[in-house]
Amino acid sequence: MDVIPAIDLLDGRCVRLYQGDYQQSQVYNDNPVEVARQWADQGATYLHLVDLDGAKQGKPVNLASIEAIIRGISIPVQVGGGLRDRASIVQLFNLGVDRAIVGTVAVENPTLVKELCAEFPRKIAVGIDARNGKVATRGWLETSEVIATELAQEMAQLGAAAIIYTDIHRDGTLSGPNREALRELASNIEIPVIASGGISSLTDLLGLLSLEPLGVTGVIVGKALYTGDVDLSEALRAIGPGRWQDVPPDIDSSLFG
């Protein structure tokens, strides 16, 4: 399973939010390139970048930081936040972004998603951010009546490369991932699902391994890396390619100290 470090960009700095609340942001580093290099040096093979200003404004904002990160590391990155038209996505691909993540537009303009998936095969992922099973949009500032599982099925049919599923109530809380929601989602679609939100420990990561056969192929880790609750190199050894071994999902955390 892929372990993907998250770098959230706000005003060009690396921050973390609590449950997506812009008023509860904590700056971890003024230099996101430094952070990206740190994760790459520890063995990351992919990075997840979120343009928080972009998510709010509906267009990419932190382009300079994104470009600097891409130039500063040799591993691919995916980017989400405010990608609501073709021009914004092309702009990112021209910078060297490997994969673009659309969210709001999946709810508001699925036809555009279909066109993008056809034009950029395997390059468009759909971020589904849910509150109580319903999809939130516009930087998590609004909640729609769209059911997350139904949207995932529609996006899979339109050609999305993957679904990145975030449980907003758990994001930035270190309260553990929503395994039941992930199980339901992955069971209903044929494309990969990447889990996001709430990871707090190595035990949480090991607990996701039972979902891998269903199609949960990766996990995005944010706050736990920055607080030190999860050590990236240890996480990669535990659940990444060439991991120690397949571990039962409800392993006693005491085994790992």
Curated annotation (Swiss-Prot):
GO biological-process terms attached to the record: L-histidine biosynthetic process; L-tryptophan biosynthetic process
Molecular functions per Gene Ontology: 1-(5-phosphoribosyl)-5-[(5-phosphoribosylamino)methylideneamino]imidazole-4-carboxamide isomerase activity
InterPro entries listed in its UniProt record: Aldolase_TIM, His_biosynth, HisA_bact_arch, Isoase_HisA-like, Isoase_HisA-like_bact, RibuloseP-bd_barrel
EC numbers for this chain: 5.3.1.16
Associated pathway: Amino-acid biosynthesis; L-histidine biosynthesis; L-histidine from 5-phospho-alpha-D-ribose 1-diphosphate: step 4/9
Active site: 8, 129
Family: Belongs to the HisA/HisF family.
PANTHER family hit by this protein: 1-(5-PHOSPHORIBOSYL)-5-[(5-PHOSPHORIBOSYLAMINO)METHYLIDENEAMINO] IMIDAZOLE-4-CARBOXAMIDE ISOMERASE
Record-given protein name: 1-(5-phosphoribosyl)-5-[(5-phosphoribosylamino)methylideneamino] imidazole-4-carboxamide isomerase
Origin species: Rippkaea orientalis (strain PCC 8801 / RF-1) (Cyanothece sp. (strain PCC 8801))
Lineage, opening ranks: Bacteria, Bacillati, Cyanobacteriota, Cyanophyceae, Oscillatoriophycideae
Gene name of this polypeptide: hisA
